[in-house]
């Protein structure tokens, strides 16, 4: 949880990190901003065709073209990503964090911003000892993870059968 009693999440809880730093959440915040101020959201609405069609990808594309609303939304998402990651680094003290998924793939500078925020917000020993990198698996992480789990489960059965 990033914000107790915060934004509603797809998991039906509130305040989840994903509800602030996920791609779907970026799109939701953009749609809300465009509905509240259609003039500020004009570039997003035009790009998407309608307010309800605005997605995280729409925001990243508008950001790349210098849209001020998209810049504010992307900056906020980067901050949420970094703050949540700082909490993870404080709690687990990992040697490496690999960031992936649609938000990271849609806007690679998130990784640099996450590093900056972790360095500023996490406990010094943990922050100094962690490497934060972007995944090289792109959209294949889930498939590779599932295949790895299946292989490991098969190998476990195979090993057990040999030793029995």
Describe these PLM feature segments:
Residues 4-164:
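ATP-binding/phosphotransfer module of carbohydrate and carboxylate kinases, centering on a glycine-rich
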């Amino acid at each position: 949880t990033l914000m107790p009693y915060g934004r509603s999440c797809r998991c039906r809880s509130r305040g989840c990190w994903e509800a602030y730093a996920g791609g779907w959440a970026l799109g939701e915040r953009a749609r809300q901003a465009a509905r509240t101020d259609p003039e500020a959201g004009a570039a997003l609405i035009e790009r998407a065709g309608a307010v309800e069609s605005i997605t995280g990808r729409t925001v990243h594309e508008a950001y790349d073209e210098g849209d001020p609303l998209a810049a504010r939304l992307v900056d906020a998402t980067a901050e949420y990503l970094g703050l949540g990651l700082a909490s993870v680094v404080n709690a687990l003290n990992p040697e490496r964090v690999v960031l992936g998924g649609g938000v990271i793939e849609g806007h690679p500078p998130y990784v640099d911003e996450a590093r900056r925020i972790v360095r500023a917000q996490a406990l010094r020993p943990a922050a100094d000892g962690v490497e934060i990198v972007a995944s090289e698996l792109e959209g294949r992480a889930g498939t590779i993870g599932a295949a790895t789990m299946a292989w490991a489960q098969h190998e476990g059965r195979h090993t057990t059968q040999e030793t029995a």
